[in-house]
A protein has these predicted regions:
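Register position in tetratricopeptide repeats
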Residues: 71, 105-106, 150-151, 196, ...
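Residue-level recognition of tetratricopeptide repeat
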Residues: 67, 101, 105-108, 146, ...
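Alpha-helical segment of the N-proximal tetratricopeptide repeat
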Residues: 57-88, 105-116, 185, 189, ...
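Structural marker of alpha-solenoid helical repeat scaffolds
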Residues: 88, 133, 179, 213-214, ...
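Helix-start (N-cap) detector for alpha-helical repeat units in TPR-like alpha-solenoids
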Residues: 59-60, 93-94, 138-142, 184-185, ...
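Canonical tetratricopeptide repeat
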Residues: 98, 143, 189, 223, ...
Length: 442
């Protein structure tokens, strides 16, 4: 038997009377929910469960990143960081000037004239943009002078353009010093310009002023090393390169320049140590740069250790297999080792270019694994003229009636005479090669 409370209906719903306060509360909740839903749909209200938006980076953070990468020796990464900073702050002349300086430094890590010129031209564009924004800033003017001076490279530009660039560099650095006579970088860059104007004694006085103003800049010691090199004071230059390295220990081009000075003094072990340090820095950064291996290869070749030289140039070719300059270096090593057949093949790739099969054979690559690489030959310039000369000499020496190579040799010699008619030493070498081919009726 079930107990049923009195008045409790069992088989129908009980209708309660409405509570006005309860109804008002529910309506308020519904209306509020509608507003929230609408806000979420239009983006006016953000859900607490949405991921937090990534904060926007400010230019200063990219500058700090660039400085850190520069100190680590990663010039490419530093340049990219400064470019990002400038994208956020395009009217900052100081950033553009610093980017111009980094871009100029990066040219020291390139091997062909075309690559170097392109890097320096880009640096010049950045310097020009900086000057437009701050025409009376001493540091911006100093960096413009530095960049213009590096662009005034006789191996890369005509004599007329070289003199014009030097003149503008001189004007910029003079103005920089007028604005701030204690600007150590301006004084150092002025000394560098004076060396390039063949005013070495004046350059020595100017770099002394830079050292007195502030010797904490890497560039002040770099330029002093350059001044000492121009005076053939290689021992003093080595000391200055070492000081520059103390201030910027991971810049590979400083280690390379130190090594070149050791090599000039035939201090080959010390030279190789400097070049090996550049290799080590690049490995730490994950950079595959052929330049230190070229320096090592040339050093071994000077010592007559051609096997070690060949091994290092092969490594360089692995890193940059389409670079014709590297085939020229390989040809020079084969030439010194009196391996004339291999020298001829390598020089052909450097001067005339070669197909994928020829480049693969020289690189000793695996055709089943390595990508095919064709090589475009170098034009005849100041930077490539010795490859042309040696190639012509090898062609003349290897001429046989059954395998005639003098026709190509004579083409090389004619091209050389047209391009460098006033280079007496080179023309004398050309004449010797022509004499060989003339005996065969060419």
């Amino acid at each position: 038997m079930y107990y049923v409370p009195e008045g409790k209906p069992l088989f129908r719903r009980q209708h309660r009377r409405s509570n006005p306060y309860r109804v008002f509360f529910l309506l308020t909740l519904i209306i509020g929910a509608l507003f929230v839903y609408r806000g979420l749909a239009t983006g006016e209200v953000v859900s607490p469960f949405e991921p937090t938006p990534t904060p926007t980076r400010v230019p200063a953070s990219f500058v700090l990143q660039g400085q850190t990468l520069f100190e680590a020796g990663d010039l490419t990464g530093a340049i990219a960081a400064y470019q990002q900073a400038i994208a956020l702050d395009p009217d900052n002349a100081s950033l553009l000037a610093e980017l111009a300086r980094l871009q100029a430094y990066s040219s020291t890590l390139l091997t062909t004239d075309a690559q170097v010129l392109a890097a320096l031209r880009q640096a010049k564009e950045y310097a020009d943009q900086a000057i437009e924004l701050a025409p009376d800033d001493s540091m911006v003017l100093a960096i413009k002078a530095f960049v213009y001076n590096w662009n005034a490279n006789g191996s890369l530009v005509s004599e007329e353009e070289r003199l014009a660039l030097l003149s503008e560099a001189e004007q910029a650095v003079t103005r920089a010093i007028d604005l701030d006579s204690r600007n150590a970088l301006a004084l150092a860059y002025s000394a560098e310009i004076l060396v390039d104007q063949q005013q070495v004694l004046d350059a020595e006085d100017r770099i002394r002023l830079a050292l007195e103003a502030d010797d904490s800049y890497m560039d002040v010691h770099r330029v002093n090393a350059y001044v000492q090199e121009s005076l053939a004071n290689y021992g003093e230059a080595i000391v200055e390169w070492q000081k520059a390295i103390e201030l910027a220990p991971n810049l590979t081009f400083l280690h390379l320049r130190l090594g070149y000075n050791y090599r000039s003094l035939q201090m080959y072990d010390q030279a190789l140590e400097s070049f090996a340090r550049a290799v080590e820095i690049n490995k730490q950064l994950g950079i595959q740069d052929p330049v230190p291996y070229i320096a090592i290869a040339k050093t071994y070749a000077q010592q007559g250790e051609f096997f070690a030289a060949s091994w290092n140039i092969q490594t360089a070719l692995e890193y940059d297999p389409a670079n014709p300059d590297l085939y020229g270096v390989a040809g020079d090593i084969f030439y010194r080792a009196r391996n004339y057949e291999s020298a001829m093949e390598a020089f052909h790739c450097a001067v005339r270019g070669c197909d994928a099969d020829a480049s693969c054979e020289l690189r000793q690559c695996d055709q089943e694994v390595d990508l095919p690489v064709t090589v475009e030959g170098l034009p005849l310039t100041e930077g490539s003229k010795w490859y042309y000369l040696e190639y012509g000499q090898v062609l003349a020496a290897l001429h046989r009636n059954a395998s005639p190579t003098c026709p190509e040799a004579m083409d090389i010699f004619r091209e050389f005479r047209r391009t460098f008619p006033d280079d007496e030493l080179a023309i004398s070498i050309v004449s010797a090669g022509e004499a060989i081919c003339e005996r065969f009726g060419y």
